[in-house]
């Protein structure tokens, strides 16, 4: 076992992975046979449950881990549903399940899903698309590398709340994936 200490590590991990909802055969996201996912350990660039599993894994061996919602994208919160006036979506051809993007008061990009709509109102869901889901990951650690102080600082200011860590966009991710398949609805 690797048994790395989260607080003392200044390394990036490189992994291949695929993820399914537990009990399903449908792959939600995968980078197998593509560019590895690289993330800086301890900077919330991926979900907590997967990071913990990576730190315990043997390099070069396929591992499997089931991650509860609390260690993934959180439990589904009905309070994250919001009804807004339809005119806020003027010029947009709405479809149930489509992803839309907006900005928070502090200018962070946020993804939401159109749950339902009428002629006057739209029901928007701000939960992550995988909130409330138990996820089954199959992954292989390809290796670790030392990271510079600049990379660590950049991860905290640019991509530290990315898709896998903070329910936002794909900031700071290398390889175009992060294990969450944010584009699905």
From Swiss-Prot:
A GO MF label: peptidyl-prolyl cis-trans isomerase activity
Broad enzyme group: isomerase
UniProt xrefs under Pfam families: FKBP_C
Gene Ontology biological process: protein refolding
Region ranges (PPIase second part): 134-156
GO cellular component terms given for this protein: cytosol
Family annotation (SUPFAM superfamilies): FKBP-like (SSF54534)
Listed InterPro entries: PPIase_dom_sf, PPIase_FKBP_dom, SlpA/SlyD-like_ins_sf
Location of the PPIase FKBP-type domain: 1-99
Keyword Metal-binding recorded: yes
Chain residues that bind Ni(2+): 163-164, 178
UniProt main location, coarse: cytoplasm
Annotated stretches, region: PPIase first part: 1-74
Biological role stated in the UniProt entry: Folding helper with both chaperone and peptidyl-prolyl cis-trans isomerase (PPIase) activities. Chaperone activity prevents aggregation of unfolded or partially folded proteins and promotes their correct folding. PPIases catalyze the cis-trans isomerization of Xaa-Pro bonds of peptides, which accelerates slow steps of protein folding and thus shortens the lifetime of intermediates. Both strategies lower the concentration of intermediates and increase the productivity and yield of the folding reaction.
Domains as described in the record: The N-terminal region consists of two globular folded domains that contain prolyl isomerase and chaperone activities. The C-terminal region binds nickel ions.
PANTHER family tied to this protein: FKBP-TYPE PEPTIDYL-PROLYL CIS-TRANS ISOMERASE SLYD
Name listed for the protein in its UniProt record: FKBP-type peptidyl-prolyl cis-trans isomerase SlyD
């Amino acid at each position: 076992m690797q048994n790395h200490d989260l607080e003392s590590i200044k390394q990036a991990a490189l992994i291949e992975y695929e993820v399914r909802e537990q009990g399903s055969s449908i792959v939600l996201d995968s980078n197998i046979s593509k560019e590895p996912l690289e993330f800086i350990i301890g900077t919330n660039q991926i979900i907590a449950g997967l990071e913990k599993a990576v730190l315990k894994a043997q390099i070069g061996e396929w591992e499997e881990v089931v991650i509860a919602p609390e260690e993934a994208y959180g439990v589904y919160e009905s309070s994250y549903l919001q009804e807004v006036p339809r005119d806020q979506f003027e010029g947009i051809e709405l479809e149930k399940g489509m992803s839309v993007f907006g900005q928070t008061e502090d200018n962070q990009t946020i993804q939401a899903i159109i749950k339902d709509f009428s002629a006057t109102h739209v029901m928007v869901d701000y939960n992550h698309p995988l909130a409330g889901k138990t996820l089954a990951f199959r992954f292989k650690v390809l290796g670790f590398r030392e990271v510079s102080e600049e990379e660590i600082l950049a991860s905290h200011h640019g991509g530290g709340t990315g898709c896998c860590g903070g329910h936002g966009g794909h900031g700071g991710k290398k390889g175009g994936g992060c294990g969450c398949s944010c584009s699905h609805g």
